[in-house]
Each structure stands twice: as C-alpha cells, then as structure tokens.
Amino acid sequence: MKEGIHPTYYHDAVVRCACGETFITGSTKKEIHVEICSKCHPFFTGKQKFVDTTGRVERFMKKYGLDQK
C-alpha cells in the first residue's frame, strides 16, 4: 500500500445514538452520530412503531386525481 493516501483508522471511534446509547467501534471517523441503533430499532426490541403514512397516500391520490370517493 502507498504511504500517506489512506485515511486514519480509529480503533476507538465512539458511536452515539439519538436514544442516548453509545458504543465503541473501529472507523475512519473519530465520532459517529446515528438516529437508530440496535438498542432502539424495532427489529431488535420487538416493539413496533407505526409511522403515519396515511396522509402521504391521501395527498398522492388527491394530486393525481385518484380519489376513490
């Protein structure tokens, strides 16, 4: 490998989640911020989060004249 062209690798990079969880990993960035992690993701927690997409579908139907009234 060529010298001086590779990014610095940090073996103790800190990952911070929006839920407050932090853990250490290896990365080319010293600190990483994420919105969701294994402590708060529904797949790992077993809890379901419902996202309100009804309004988006209704807007799409109305925009393209596909109202089913």
UniProtKB/Swiss-Prot annotation:
Zn(2+) binds at C17, C19, C37, C40. GO terms for biological process: translation. InterPro entries: Ribosomal_bL28/bL31-like_sf, Ribosomal_bL31, Ribosomal_bL31_A, Ribosomal_bL31_sf. Gene3D superfamilies: Ribosomal protein L31. GO terms for molecular function: metal ion binding; rRNA binding; structural constituent of ribosome. Its cofactor is Zn(2+). GO terms for cellular component: ribonucleoprotein complex; ribosome. PROSITE patterns: RIBOSOMAL_L31. The keyword tRNA-binding does not apply. Binds 1 zinc ion per subunit. Keywords: Metal-binding, Ribonucleoprotein, Ribosomal protein, RNA-binding, rRNA-binding, Zinc. Belongs to the bacterial ribosomal protein bL31 family. Type A subfamily. Part of the 50S ribosomal subunit. Binds the 23S rRNA. This is Large ribosomal subunit protein bL31. It comes from Caldicellulosiruptor bescii (strain ATCC BAA-1888 / DSM 6725 / KCTC 15123 / Z-1320) (Anaerocellum thermophilum).
